[in-house]
């Protein structure tokens, strides 16, 4: 089963802002579906059912307080001249989100999991497969723009089923803030 640990985006103001940007940007890429918006705190990959149970137990030992995050600015990975990912940035709550991702990893390292790169708080809103051209001008107008805020009060272990129409996510377990 393909799984990951995530913080879901559920605030309607944020989701409406994302939908608006996805419509405004003229990019030959695939917009992420609004109901799939999330931060991937840690991608675990293909995991056997027995190990998933152990992952759940480890995640349920996690203690964190609820906190707020705010979304500001639009950027691109690896860079706006050759974009592959278009993202929203995080301002308020960035450090807490980074710490939460570290805490998740610390819980899961004993089970053999590790991140291949440090967690960088961003919300993917587009994926681009083929060269889309330089989008610097398109995204620069959003550099200081706020897109709303949300309270982070839970994380989820989620299953991802890949289909030709896009991924289908389902919750395996929800861990609420203490």
Residue ranges and their predicted role:
Residues 1-178:
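Histidine-dependent nucleotide/RNA phosphoesterase domain, centered on the 2H-phosphoesterase fold
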């Amino acid at each position: 089963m393909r799984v990951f640990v995530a913080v879901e985006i559920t605030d309607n103001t944020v989701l409406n802002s994302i939908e608006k940007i996805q419509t405004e940007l003229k990019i030959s890429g695939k917009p992420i579906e609004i109901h799939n918006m999330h931060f991937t705190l840690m991608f675990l990959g293909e995991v056997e059912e027995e190990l998933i149970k152990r992952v759940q137990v480890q995640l349920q030992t996690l203690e964190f307080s609820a906190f707020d995050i705010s979304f500001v600015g639009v950027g691109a990975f690896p860079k706006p001249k050759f974009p592959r990912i278009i993202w929203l940035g995080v301002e308020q709550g960035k450090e807490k989100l980074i710490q939460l991702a570290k805490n998740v990893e610390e819980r899961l390292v004993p089970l053999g999991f590790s991140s291949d790169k440090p967690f960088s708080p961003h919300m993917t809103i587009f994926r681009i497969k083929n060269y889309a051209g330089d989008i610097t001008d398109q995204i620069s107008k959003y550099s200081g723009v706020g897109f709303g805020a949300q309270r982070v009060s839970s994380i989820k272990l989620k299953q991802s089923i890949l289909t030709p129409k896009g991924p289908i996510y389902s919750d395996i377990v929800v861990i609420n803030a203490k």
